[in-house]
């Protein structure tokens, strides 16, 4: 089966733009706050939130690079979505999509590919927002000397919320697709 490429939906385009803004903020925030940091900063914190290792403030500049990896990969996958679905379907593990896509009229298939990538973009955006919050908490901790409770809350949020929202969104799209084919 070959699905013709089409542009993202308006929702997908908005999520893509928000992702680009979030990635830019992941880089902008550290660059803007870097000059406010002392030369020696806490670079590791123990379980209680107290620093247990110190180093140069330059070490903190790795955060935007590390935090940008997952969102950047998701944006690349989104850009290549039709190539992946048409040539390498084994890399896209969406059983409900593959079970139903053959039942959808050919001219609507690209629409549904784009709809299934909306939650992927939302996942990336939530991760980026969580990473930005973690970045803020870490930079705040370098000045205050202690990780704020906010860091731990965001850490839990970054782990749990994206997956919950991702699977909820996917199930909604699968239900809409099933309604379109009359099941």
Curated annotation (Swiss-Prot):
Q: Which domain of life is it from?
A: Archaea
Q: Which residue ranges does UniProt annotate as crossing the membrane?
A: 13-35, 60-82, 117-139, 149-171
Instruction: Name it.
Output: Uncharacterized protein AF_0163
Give the location in the cell: Cell membrane
Organism source for this protein?
A: Archaeoglobus fulgidus (strain ATCC 49558 / DSM 4304 / JCM 9628 / NBRC 100126 / VC-16)
Bilayer topology: Multi-pass membrane protein
Q: What is its main location?
A: membrane
UniProt GO cellular component terms: plasma membrane
Query: What stretch or stretches form a coiled coil here?
Result: none
- Supply the alphabetized keyword list: Cell membrane, Membrane, Transmembrane, Transmembrane helix
Under InterPro entries, the record lists: DUF1648 (IPR012867)
